[in-house]
């Protein structure tokens, strides 16, 4: 136990010894004299404008309690009055002054001062800021000291530690220097408008600096700066303007193209519509033209089986006790056409006559010449004055014939254009084939030979023209005698009774019946709606011997002309055979001049035995006129 106490006591004694040992050392140190802090020398700097500079102020002693202060041209730089581009940083034993983006205003003398209990110390440095592109060059020796500036010199202390970011070259110098403008004589040192400066240094000879204009460089501003875009903002604006211009042009072209396409589509549609309308109008016009060319849409009867039934009934009612009228039917059928060796066949029907044999017979004869003449209508029919119309009436009197001949002579040319002329008739007829037409006359075997049945006058059929024979002995039209077999059959097949009203005793004695009437029927004659009203009133039976129509007691009685002298049966038969021979030898429309032929045939009508009419006799001149009326204008070669 006593050892531990000793040990403790020993330890305590050691600590005391240590503490007592230090105290005499500090006492000894405090007794030595203390030295004030000393600053290291700062170096002056020269730099171009816009560069970064750093000034450092350091002490050589290790004294901790030190304060640093910075001054510029004798003015303290504190937070209130220091520029924004100058910053002061404090570190242990040193202080730094940083200048960012130095400018000419930053040039001057900077001083650093250290303050402590032991003492104070200071150090200074000059900072020279030069514009860019200025190069310090040496002047010749002859010019040194020749210039004395009246301006106060500027001392520049340049430190080698400064950072120079300028493109111009610089030389570091020690000591102070002066930068003044060149005199008038030395301004020619810089060319191309450069500004001249002179740097004076006590230790070094004076030098000249040149501040060049934009676009030039070099020691004397003799070199040209390479071509480059100096202002980037202007270049960007120009580029943007160009881009906008090109974009606007492209958009305008696109809009124009779209408008062109739309306009083309619209015009194409309109053109298509117009073409469709034109096509429809052309189709309608073609249809109308075809309808006009084809005529009205009414069914036409087929030409293979044409049946024409003409029924004519007298409007004046006659008692059945006196007159029995029968309707005449004329039937044409193409299935029963008969072909002959000649060009045409004309069917001629004659009413029942008795040639001194006391019997009424129906004669069916065929001649080999077609002379179709329905009626002759004067051109004055269409005039406003309503001129008379001449027509050939089978039952008319001499007055009608004379008036007809008069008007026919007055207008020979206008007749050719009449719808009743041979041109129209021959154009619608084909006289190559004819079908026989049976004409049944209601007659009785007991009737006198001079009597004629009334239906002959009541029938109105297209009236053919008659050919005039140049022979003296021919006084009747060209006929073919019906065979006896056919005569007997017809005589037996049509027995009829006549009323006493039709019996004329004045014609019983010494009179021959009139020449047989003939009816020329064309097999292909078409009665259209246009010509039916004009042809119906003029379709009358005609013969070389005229019959006169009389109206006794309101009834129609047709009496034929008969000859006053009766001829023998042999002479009549001879004349019929001669007529048959002449009819066979007569060509179709052989007479070219009807007027000359009728004049040549004039003696043929001057016979001793003249045929008389109960109402009056025809003179020879009237018979000639009747012949002329039957053949007028039917020999037109153009119509044939």
From Swiss-Prot:
Q: Where is this site: Breakpoint for translocation to form gamma-heregulin?
A: 34
Name the tissues where it is expressed.
Type I isoforms are the predominant forms expressed in the endocardium. Isoform alpha is expressed in breast, ovary, testis, prostate, heart, skeletal muscle, lung, placenta liver, kidney, salivary gland, small intestine and brain, but not in uterus, stomach, pancreas, and spleen. Isoform 3 is the predominant form in mesenchymal cells and in non-neuronal organs, whereas isoform 6 is the major neuronal form. Isoform 8 is expressed in spinal cord and brain. Isoform 9 is the major form in skeletal muscle cells; in the nervous system it is expressed in spinal cord and brain.
Give the compositionally biased regions (Basic residues). 542-552
Q: Name the reported effect of residue 181 to E.
A: Defective in integrin-binding and in inducing ERBB3 phosphorylation. No effect on ERBB3-binding, defective in integrin-binding and in ternary complex formation with ERBB3 and integrins, and defective in inducing NRG1-ERBB signaling
Glycosites: 120, 126, 164
Q: What is the effect of changing residue 187 to E?
A: Defective in integrin-binding and in inducing ERBB3 phosphorylation. No effect on ERBB3-binding, defective in integrin-binding and in ternary complex formation with ERBB3 and integrins, and defective in inducing NRG1-ERBB signaling
Please provide, in alphabetical order, the Gene Ontology terms of the cellular component aspect for this entry. Answer: apical plasma membrane; extracellular region; extracellular space; glutamatergic synapse; membrane; nucleoplasm; plasma membrane
- Please state the pathology the record ties to this protein: A chromosomal aberration involving NRG1 produces gamma-heregulin. Translocation t(8;11) with TENM4. The translocation fuses the 5'-end of TENM4 to NRG1 (isoform 8). The product of this translocation was first thought to be an alternatively spliced isoform. Gamma-heregulin is a soluble activating ligand for the ERBB2-ERBB3 receptor complex and acts as an autocrine growth factor in a specific breast cancer cell line (MDA-MB-175). Not detected in breast carcinoma samples, including ductal, lobular, medullary, and mucinous histological types, neither in other breast cancer cell lines.
Q: Name one GO biological process term.
A: ERBB signaling pathway
As for PTM, the annotation reads: Proteolytic cleavage close to the plasma membrane on the external face leads to the release of the soluble growth factor form. N- and O-glycosylated. Extensive glycosylation precedes the proteolytic cleavage.
Query: What PROSITE patterns does the record tag this protein with?
Result: EGF_1, EGF_2, EGF_3, IG_LIKE
Asked if the record carries the keyword Membrane, the reply is yes
Q: Which residues lie on this side of the membrane: Extracellular?
A: 20-242
Disordered as annotated region, ranges: 1-53, 334-360, 375-399, 433-461, 524-588
Q: Write down the species.
A: Homo sapiens (Human)
Indicate the transmembrane segments per the record: 243-265
Specify the taxonomic lineage.
Eukaryota, Metazoa, Chordata, Craniata, Vertebrata
Cross-referenced InterPro entries: EGF-like_dom (IPR000742), Ig-like_dom (IPR007110), Ig-like_dom_sf (IPR036179), Ig-like_fold (IPR013783), Ig_I-set (IPR013098), Ig_sub (IPR003599), Ig_sub2 (IPR003598), Neuregulin (IPR040180)
Instruction: Report keywords, A-Z.
Output: Cell membrane, Chromosomal rearrangement, Disulfide bond, EGF-like domain, Glycoprotein, Growth factor, Immunoglobulin domain, Membrane, Nucleus, Secreted, Transmembrane, Transmembrane helix
GO MF term set: chemorepellent activity; cytokine activity; ErbB-3 class receptor binding; growth factor activity; integrin binding; nickel cation binding; protein tyrosine kinase activator activity; receptor ligand activity
- Propeptide, chain numbering: 1-19
Every EGF-like domain range: 178-222
**Which stretches does UniProt call biased (Polar residues)?**
351-360
What family is this? Belongs to the neuregulin family.
* Protein's UniProt name: Pro-neuregulin-1, membrane-bound isoform
* Residues on Cytoplasmic side: 266-640
Which SUPFAM superfamilies does the record associate with it? EGF/Laminin, Immunoglobulin
Biased composition annotated in UniProt, kind: Low complexity? 334-350, 563-574
